[in-house]
Swiss-Prot record:
Domain of life: Bacteria
Cross-referenced PANTHER family: INNER MEMBRANE PROTEIN YHJD (PTHR30213), UPF0761 MEMBRANE PROTEIN YIHY (PTHR30213:SF0)
Record has Cell inner membrane as a keyword: yes
Transmembrane segments: 52-72, 108-128, 148-168, 190-210, 220-240, 254-274
Homology family: Belongs to the UPF0761 family.
Alphabetical keyword list: Cell inner membrane, Cell membrane, Membrane, Transmembrane, Transmembrane helix
Cellular localization per UniProt: Cell inner membrane
Keyword flag Cell membrane: yes
A GO cellular-component term linked to this record: plasma membrane
InterPro entries, alphabetized: UPF0761_bac, Virul_fac_BrkB
UniProt organism field: Chlorobium chlorochromatii (strain CaD3)
NCBIfam families: yihY_not_rbn
The protein's name in its UniProt record: UPF0761 membrane protein Cag_0935
Topology of this chain in the membrane: Multi-pass membrane protein
Length: 432
């Protein structure tokens, strides 16, 4: 009896493996499309430029906060080394000296200049917040008081948490583990993993707390793990590039640290944004499933009608949607297909983008008929059908019949779209 079930079990396993592979391929395509659509590499460039302008003010604020607490004074040098050497591989010591020299000069500036440094540091955090929320399709800025409180908390509590972590780690390593015996090798390996673990924790908190959307813990952890691995690979590649390939020192001399610093900061922001995009895609990805849609000539209208119905209902509720928000409402549709349809409706001036990047209706659905929408949506014709339609040797004169069909369609599809959507909504409510 068991032997008879073996082929069936193998068949089901093969089907399951094939579905997993198809789902993985579809997710990779979805992830790649979102990377290009959200212009991750352009956003990373703008963040890198702003980071170069803000790095000294941020370090000045961080070190000023630490100076307020004498208990953290012994760990200040450790924090400086940790931030700078992990901030840029290969040139950390040189950069350490420059940055501390610049930060030291900020102590002599007047009160107005100190406030300006603080504002610059806050602006960097605000840009990071806005860029990450753009990935989730959230363009509504935080309220001024809420944003100020959040950024102030990050600037003040962030350094304290890092120093506390370093202090706790130092206590564990130097009290529990000794420099002699079998635990020495274990201690060395754990210390080597410490920066990687710190990266995972930092990315996890970033992806969990910054987006103004509910993010699953598993998705945030997966994104943090991916970003941490990419960061480690980027460090190794950058170290190899600087030591074996780059010619910055031959061209710029003492100023070579500037382009190298910008290049590394750009890579770091690419890693951060790629990880955020990965977290978003884990939550937004929904593989297409076959539906029982009628296979008639009107089947191409189901998608645009779903888009218009969703936007129409959202606008009536006073909550317009962006493309990302629309994809969450229509989660069963592939994102690529939905984006192409939205682009088509934008091109045909049925929709337009508001100043905040939200989708809005350009046509009055109470005046626009179903036939007008039918004319807008292209119906694909395969190569065989084209050859039959346009073959001169076997031409069939269908012009009179085509006119009659068009007239019939125009008459039968004169129903306004809004009325059709209302009837569909009432029917769905009755069924429920």
């Amino acid at each position: 009896m068991l032997m008879k079930k073996v082929p069936h079990i193998i068949h089901r396993a093969n089907q399951s493996g094939g579905k997993r592979y198809e789902r993985m391929v579809a997710f990779v395509a979805f992830f790649r499309t979102n990377l290009l659509h959200d212009r991750i590499f352009i956003s990373a460039g703008s963040l890198a430029f702003q980071t170069l302008l803000s790095i000294v003010p941020v370090l000045a604020v961080v070190l000023s906060v630490l100076n307020l607490f004498e208990v953290f004074t012994p760990f200040q040098h450790s924090l400086e080394t940790f931030l700078v050497e992990n901030f840029m591989p290969a040139t950390g010591r040189l950069l350490h000296g420059y940055l501390l020299e610049f930060v030291g000069k900020t102590g002599n500036i007047p009160l107005l200049g100190s406030l300006l440094l603080f504002v610059i540091a806050l602006s960097l955090l605000s840009t990071v917040d806005q860029t990450l929320n753009d990935i989730w399709g959230i363009r509504a800025p935080r309220k001024a008081l809420q944003g100020f409180t959040l950024y102030w908390t990050v600037l003040t509590l962030g350094p304290l948490l890092i120093v506390s972590s370093l202090a706790a780690s130092s206590y564990v390593w130097y009290t529990i583990f000794t420099d002699e015996g079998a635990l020495f090798e274990l201690k060395t390996r754990l210390l080597a993993l410490f920066p990687f673990i710190n990266s995972i924790v930092a990315f996890f908190l970033l992806y969990m707390l910054v987006p103004k959307r509910r993010v699953r813990i598993a998705h945030a952890f997966a994104g943090a793990l991916v970003a941490s691995l990419l960061l480690e690979l980027s460090k190794r590649w950058f170290l190899f590039y600087v030591t074996h390939v780059a010619t910055f020192e031959h061209i710029y001399g003492a100023l070579s640290v500037v382009p190298m610093l910008f290049f590394w900061v750009y890579l770091a922001w690419v890693v951060v944004l790629v990880g955020a995009e990965f977290v978003y895609c884990l939550g937004a990805f929904a593989p297409s499933t076959p539906t029982a849609e009628a296979q008639g000539s009107l089947r191409y209208l189901s998608l645009p009608l779903a888009v218009l119905a969703t936007l129409h209902n959202a606008i009536e509720k006073g909550a317009p949607l962006s493309l990302k928000s629309l994809s969450r409402e229509l989660s069963t549709l592939p994102f690529n297909l939905l984006r192409d349809m939205v682009d088509l409706l934008l091109d045909r001036q049925v929709l337009h983008l508001s100043t905040r990047g939200e989708l809005a209706l350009s046509r009055n659905l109470h005046a626009m008929s179903l036939y007008e929408l039918y004319q807008i949506i292209p119906q694909p014709i395969n190569a065989t059908e084209k050859s039959l339609l346009f073959s001169e040797s076997k031409s069939v004169h269908l012009a009179p019949l085509s006119l009659e069909v068009e007239a019939c369609l125009q008459e039968r599809m004169a129903t306004p779209i809004a009325e059709l959507l209302q009837h569909s909504f009432l029917k769905a409510s009755t069924v429920d």
